[in-house]
């Protein structure tokens, strides 16, 4: 059975690139362009991993992650934040979320899928 990945990013170019890379690596991929849709899809599809942008139009990715942590169905799903902001405050924000790590932008297309797999349980 293929692993499921959910990508939440409002930038269509990033979304399609990440989707293509994960599909080539064998993932079944679901996508959302805002946090609310991403939360709903996570609850419905129960992905093995979530790849989420930190800056979404309706809320920060870290806020969406905290909502997912409150739900027994989604609390243990690892989250990979993809962010251009690797400043200390952003890193601290991510460290405060269990099961969360980050990959800096721009992503490395050669290693992205491998990095995502490494963060899965």
Task: Describe each PLM feature range.
Residues 45-51, 56:
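Active-site beta3 strand of CheY-like receiver
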Residues 15, 57, 75, 87:
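The feature encodes the CheY-like receiver
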Residues 16-24:
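Charged docking surfaces used in two-component/phosphorelay signaling
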């Amino acid at each position: 059975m293929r692993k499921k990945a959910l990508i939440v990013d409002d930038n269509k170019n990033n979304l399609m690139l990440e989707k293509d890379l994960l599909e080539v690596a064998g993932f079944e991929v679901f996508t959302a362009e805002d946090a609310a849709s991403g939360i709903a899809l996570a609850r419905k599809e129960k992905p093995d991993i979530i790849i989420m942008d930190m800056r979404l139009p309706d809320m920060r990715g870290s806020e969406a992650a905290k909502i997912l942590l409150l739900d027994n169905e989604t609390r243990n799903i690892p989250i990979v934040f993809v962010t251009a902001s690797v400043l200390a405050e952003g890193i601290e924000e991510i460290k405060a979320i269990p099961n969360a790590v980050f990959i800096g932008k721009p992503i490395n297309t050669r290693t992205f899928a491998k990095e995502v797999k490494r963060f899965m349980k």
